[in-house]
Swiss-Prot record:
Family affiliation: Belongs to the NDC80/HEC1 family.
Gene3D superfamilies, alphabetized: Ncd80 complex, Ncd80 subunit
Compartments, as annotated in UniProt: Nucleus; Chromosome, Centromere, Kinetochore
One Gene Ontology cellular component: nucleus
This protein's name: Probable kinetochore protein NDC80
Gene Ontology MF: a single term: microtubule binding
Residue runs in coiled coils: 293-343, 375-447, 541-584
Function text: Acts as a component of the essential kinetochore-associated NDC80 complex, which is required for chromosome segregation and spindle checkpoint activity.
Keywords from the UniProt entry: Cell cycle, Cell division, Centromere, Chromosome, Coiled coil, Kinetochore, Mitosis, Nucleus
Keyword Cell division in annotation: yes
Composition bias type Polar residues, residue spans: 39-60, 108-121
Any one GO BP annotation for this protein: cell division
Length: 671
């Protein structure tokens, strides 16, 4: 099974082949390969901390079991879960236009696309200075028709509330365009997004956040009059891009389209999947812990049965492998018996050795004879050389005689035609020589320019390599003294590239290692840190929620105390007024005043008692919270210990199996 993520958009949206995801999500090809990849720590990864084992286990289990929900209108619970930080992009699609527009560094996509060719990549100047050009044929009628069909079908499928007319997607008004754009953005980013007074500013900000590749073609003028002939093709392409994003978001969790191994149950993974045992244990622990935490059950028969079935499948595969090895052992035993029955191969080799030694002696004698023949041939060659020298002397004499004759011929008069022909040939040869000199000069200049380009590229690569080493030291990739448990143990993150090497295969090997090993390890490390940070964030949110509840309770108690104090003041005022009015009245009135003062005293005592009881309740709640947190930590430690015991038992079982196989292999070798 291919566990690479497949396309997220169905093919039924447009008749013309379009990218399954927006072009902004496609990683642009790097001219220098993986060396141009941004390795700077992101805003989340830079805050490195030592996390507890229990938290990391819980985060890993939730990371594997959590799913990304669809965003079809009417399912707000699924949309809220999709907008959470459980997604790989950190929930950037859930930000409203009034929130921070900056996408975190962990989401920015670096250029890691390598060239299709395996040879040396081109280092011609001007590659990085060219602006991005939209490859889509925006003015093509067929492309526009496909875009309109795609947008119209999607709006109908998601029940767009406003009516769609024939002119809605050909020359819409500003109000219609704004309505469609807001509907798509609310469906993609945030259903409760608040819009400002200026639609154009919000639109540009949202498109920048979504990394729309054709930002150069979107302006405030075009957004003000989207139905204009010069503006509508760009606006239509932008709406089609948003529709593709919405489709990708709807199909984010469709098992028929994607095949993410983290979203596939561990029981359905192939037996050769790496770390299948760990994955089974993580899924089992996550499932049972969530059930236990919710108080649904104390025994997990269904989960244990699934785990038993998975281990039975693994055991059956191991038994089949053992049977295969046993058949191989029997086959080898039969071969050994056949070798014992046949003639010993050593005797055959000895006879062959005697024959070879005899051939060797004959060959040596043959070489001696050939040496004698060589000496005779050398004598003959020396005699021939002497004859050649004499012939050369005679040839020189003949040549001097020929030169004397040519001088005599030159002294004679030549015709004008012959002179003109000779001059013409000399001029043509001179021009040819000058052209050759110019070509040589141009070739030398071109070679010098290419050498300067290569030198600059090498200097730039050295700078990038220095930055990589510095950042790697900061996050502990190259410092062995730092204990970073999330790093792969068998991955060497050190890059030692000799650009001056004569063999290009060495440089290519380093590049292949960077793409296949280091990049994958860095991606795994980033995902681990992201899961850990997500777990800490969820825990912090829960604690803050509990703290807010306690604060609200305290505020309510304070309000009650304030009301009692107001009532007390009112009663005091009434008592003072009564004293001024009935100062001259009889003793019965004094008794009434005394009774009122007694009631006021009782109310004051009751209010003070209420304050004291509220404070004691707050202190008891804090103590209970601390005890609950302590119990939670103890339970997490016990869960970690139990998981460790299970892992130790599995490791021992593996070691026992390996030792058994070794004993069988040793027995086979002895036989």
């Amino acid at each position: 099974m291919d566990f690479r993520r497949q396309t997220l958009v169905s093919n039924g949206g447009s008749s013309q082949p379009q990218p399954s995801v927006p072009s902004s999500a496609i990683k642009k090809a790097s001219r220098l390969g993986p060396a141009r990849q941004s390795l700077a720590p992101s805003q989340i990864q830079s805050r490195t901390s030592i996390l507890g084992v229990s938290n990391s286990q819980e985060n890993a289990s939730h990371g594997m079991m959590g799913s990304r929900k669809s965003t079809v209108p009417g399912k707000m619970g699924d949309r809220d879960q999709l907008m959470s930080a459980s997604r790989g992009d950190g929930g950037i699609y859930g930000r409203t236009p009034q929130m921070n527009r900056g996408i975190p560094g962990s989401v920015r996509r670096s250029s890691v696309f390598t060239s299709n060719s395996q040879g040396r990549t081109s280092m011609a100047p001007g590659v990085y200075s060219t602006a991005y050009k939209d490859p889509r044929p925006l003015r093509d009628k067929v492309f526009q028709s496909n875009c309109m069909r795609n947008v119209n079908e999607y709006l109908i499928s998601v029940r767009y509330p406003l009516p769609l007319t024939a002119k809605t997607l050909t020359s819409p008004t500003a109000k219609e365009f704004q309505s469609i754009f807001k509907f798509l953005v609310n469906d993609l980013v945030d259903p409760g997004a608040a819009w400002g007074k200026k639609f154009e500013d919000d639109t540009l900000s949202i498109l920048k956040d979504l990394k729309y590749p054709g930002m150069d073609s979107v302006s405030k003028t075009a957004l003000t009059a989207p139905g204009a002939p010069q503006s509508w093709p760009n606006m239509l392409a932008m709406l089609n891009w948003l529709v593709d994003l919405c489709k990708a978001l709807d199909n984010w969790d469709d098992p028929e389209i994607i095949s993410d191994p983290l979203m596939v149950p561990a029981t359905e993974l192939p037996l050769d999947y790496p770390n299948l045992d760990d994955r089974l244990l993580w899924d089992f622990a996550a499932k049972t812990y969530s059930q236990w935490f919710d108080g649904e059950a104390e025994e997990f028969d269904e989960a244990e049965q699934e785990l038993e079935h998975a281990y039975d499948r693994m055991a059956s595969a191991t038994v089949a492998e053992c049977e295969k090895l046993e058949r191989e052992i029997q086959k080898r035993n039969v071969e050994i018996q056949q070798l014992h029955v046949q003639e010993p191969p050593l005797k055959k080799l000895e006879d062959e050795y005697v024959q070879l030694m005899s051939d060797k002696n004959k060959f040596i004698s043959f070489l001696d004879q050939q040496g004698q023949k060589i000496e005779k041939i050398r004598l003959r060659i020396s005699k021939v050389k002497e004859a050649v020298i004499s012939q050369e002397a005679e040839l020189e004499a003949r040549q001097s005689e020929l030169a004397h004759i040519e001088q005599a011929v030159a002294a004679q008069n030549l015709s004008p035609d012959e002179v003109q022909r000779m001059n013409h040939e000399r001029d043509s040869l001179t021009r040819s020589l000058e052209d050759l000199r110019n070509k040589i000069s141009e070739a030398s200049q071109f070679a010098y320019d290419q050498e300067m380009v290569v030198t600059k590229s090498m200097d730039r690569f050295e700078g990038l390599l220095t930055d990589y080493n510095s950042l790697a030291h900061q996050i502990g990739l190259l410092d062995s003294s730092l204990d970073v448990p999330s790093l792969a143990a068998n991955v060497n993150y050190n890059l030692d590239v000799d650009l001056g090497a004569e063999e290009l295969e060495e440089v290519k090997a380093v590049g292949v290692r960077m793409r296949s090993t280091i990049w994958q390890a860095l991606q795994t490390c980033r995902e681990t840190f992201r899961q850990e940070a997500l777990g800490l964030g969820n825990g912090t949110i829960a604690l803050e929620d509990e703290f807010d509840k306690l604060g609200q309770s305290v505020e309510r108690q304070k309000e009650e105390v304030g009301n009692l104090e107001v009532r007390l003041k009112i009663v005091h005022n009434q008592a003072e007024d009564a004293q001024s009015q009935i100062a001259s009245e009889n003793s019965d009135t004094n008794k009434i005043i005394t009774q009122l003062e007694t009631e006021v005293t009782n109310m004051l005592a009751a209010s003070q008692q209420g304050v004291l009881s509220t404070q004691s309740q707050l202190e008891s709640t804090r103590i209970a919270f601390k005890e609950l947190r302590h119990k939670t930590a103890l339970f997490q430690d016990s869960v970690v210990a139990e998981v460790g015991e299970h892992i130790d038992a599995i490791i021992k079982a593996k070691e026992h199996t390996a030792n058994s196989l070794k004993s069988i292999r040793a027995l086979a070798e002895t036989q």
